[in-house]
UniProtKB/Swiss-Prot annotation:
Belongs to the selenophosphate synthase 1 family. Class I subfamily. InterPro entries: PurM-like_C_dom (IPR010918), PurM-like_C_sf (IPR036676), PurM-like_N (IPR016188), PurM-like_N_sf (IPR036921), SelD_I (IPR023061), SPS/SelD (IPR004536). It comes from the Bacteria. GO terms for cellular component: cytoplasm. The active site is at 23. The keyword Heme does not apply. This is Selenide, water dikinase. It comes from Burkholderia cenocepacia (strain ATCC BAA-245 / DSM 16553 / LMG 16656 / NCTC 13227 / J2315 / CF5610). One of its GO terms (molecular function) is ATP binding. Synthesizes selenophosphate from selenide and ATP. SUPFAM superfamilies: PurM C-terminal domain-like, PurM N-terminal domain-like. The lineage of its organism: Bacteria, Pseudomonadati, Pseudomonadota, Betaproteobacteria, Burkholderiales. The gene is selD. Pfam families: AIRS, AIRS_C. Binds 1 Mg(2+) ion per monomer.
Amino acid sequence: MTEATQAQPAVPRLTSLSHGGGCGCKIAPGVLSELLKRATPPALFPDLLVGTETSDDAAVYRLNDEQAIVATTDFFMPIVDDPFDFGRIAATNALSDVYAMGGKPILALALVGMPINVLPHETIAAVLRGGESVCADAGIPVAGGHSIDSVEPIYGLAAIGVVHPSRVKRNAAARAGDVLVLGKPLGVGVLSAALKKNQLDADGYAQMVATTTKLNRPGAELAALPGVHALTDVTGFGLLGHTLELARGAQLTARVHYASLPWLAGVETFVADGVFTGASGRNWAAYGTDIRLADGLPPVAQALLTDPQTSGGLLVACVPEAVDDVLACFRADGFDRAAVIGEMADGPARVDVA
């Protein structure tokens, strides 16, 4: 064979180079909680409005009476094999934490770890372009970053945003009687597991990418609505984990209505066939003692409710009178599956699902 006709080495699948993918590769919540016990007490910094104390989505630091900085970082290993899509998903997921605090992103820095001698440079460049495309859609620059030669592919962003100090929305401020509204359908982790097992068809892949690359832009507008008390996004700890954070922060019981939950197409069938992530079980092991699942729920309920979401939806706690405005805010930005999924009530800090 001539040099021109020699077979070129196959480019490995991105997902084959990592032991986990997306937010499913987070450190288990119980382990993370133990590690963070040694964090510096936030009381030493009076302008630090939000730190690590309630496992909120981002740090918030007050600059003056009119402006605060929202700072967050998020990165993970590939959840898909297409490098451009991987970059888009990772960037969308990172920016979500700014929106979840009620903030508006202004700047991002890229965080890149790649097996530089394994992946073609054009593959790595496509990941970066994917992230830049999302940031351009959000109206912000990728102004720099940091890179290392890594055994497993890693990509994400450090994101900076701004918010008025009075409009910061924490995950610990829900009140009894608040209604819970979820912005995106659930099941991303299940679809990613199906993809890794070569069981996800083109339509399933398309819906997974569509939901994970949709910016949670309504966050800032939601934060400005009267009657919106708390805001977070549903990511690696699953719907139950992030709802439990709301419950613990407010010392209330969160009630979730299973029949009202929006699901991505096909996820219930996949779980029934045994296709779901290992992170689902780790999530349940970490917080299952504070969950009450009613009798009569489908056998797949536990795995679905703990399914790790990558770039998941915003979860809003608001007064009943604000629900129509919250849903209108979501739908004006194309979140057609936004739904009322439960409410907060007096009671022990736990989640009840019925």
